[in-house]
């Protein structure tokens, strides 16, 4: 997961910055609201998105310090209706679900386009994610208790896993 979610962003950012240093423009990395608040069952995913946030924030500071003509934005989507849960390694007793509310992929595409034309430091996609991040910042233990009590159930369908489920590669 780190190879794709973190190192993919690092390598892509480096290539993009080499071009953008000469021509100017916007670097837009896609993170997650889970870079601001962790949820149970998704510890490794949350860690990759925390890493993307830290890298993007540091890169922004470095580019600003060198005077590079590059804006750097971190898009922080909430749960998006993609096949992520169908392909992620599943160690749960049932088929996984994205916790609701789940937003359309077009909302992320629109946010990226918006930030390419109107640079912003960070942009949340999905109001629920922004509310969750704010709650976590101002009421961290209350948010922790809420996540503990709700998120494990919300991420499980209750439907049994098919015997032929094709998960991602996994090694203990």
What is each of the regions a protein language model found here?
Residues 1-2:
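A hydrophobic alpha-helix adjacent to the NAD(P)-binding/active-site core of NAD(P)-dependent oxidoreductases
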Residues 19, 37, 58-70:
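Active-site-adjacent segment of SDR/Rossmann-fold oxidoreductases
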Residues 15-24:
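A short helix-coil junction within the Rossmann-fold of NAD(P)-dependent oxidoreductases
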Residues 65-160:
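SDR active-site lid
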Residues 13, 48:
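Active-site helix of classical SDR
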Residues 39-44:
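Active-site loop immediately N-terminal to the catalytic Tyr-X3-Lys motif
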Residues 32:
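Residue(s) in the substrate-gating loop at a strand-loop-helix junction
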